[in-house]
Amino acid sequence: MEKYDVVIVGAGAAGIGIAAMLNDFGLEKMVVLEKEKVGASFDKWPKEMQFITPSFTTNGWGHIDLNGVASGTSPAYSLDTEHPSGERYARYLRLISDHFELPIKENTNVVKVTKGQEGFKIEIENGGYIQGRFLIW
């Protein structure tokens, strides 16, 4: 059984954001489990749908981009748009996960979680198990 300090379920904005933050803190024994691919929920948005909250390129002045998920990053810079579509935002999430070399297992569906004395035992669809001291879902 694979063992990690932290297991994150889901590679959307929250999952990629928390993984990037833990990576910034130097945590090495973590994994992100995603049942499809990074940003898949955003890829499913209707083509016409865009973020209401604009992305601003103000990181250079020390301000955060509310749509950014990793410190020092901005969808406005990466995508050259203030109001990204779901498809473009999914691309941003994949850029972040690739740039920071986040440990992601795509096509890994969680079917059961059991809490025990040593943390969480996570059963995945293929019948395998992963253990994590902490679980973020």
What is the meaning of each model-derived region?
Residues P75-W137:
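Feature captures the FAD/FMN-dependent oxidoreductase FAD-binding
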Residues K37-A90:
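Glycine-rich active-site loop/strand segments that organize a redox cofactor
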Residues L22-N23, W45-M49, G119:
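Short, glycine/charged-enriched secondary-structure capping and boundary segments
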Residues E2-V32:
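N-terminal Rossmann-like FAD-binding beta1-loop-alpha1 element of flavoenzymes
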Residues G15, G39, K112:
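Glycine-rich nucleotide phosphate-binding loop and flanking beta-alpha elements
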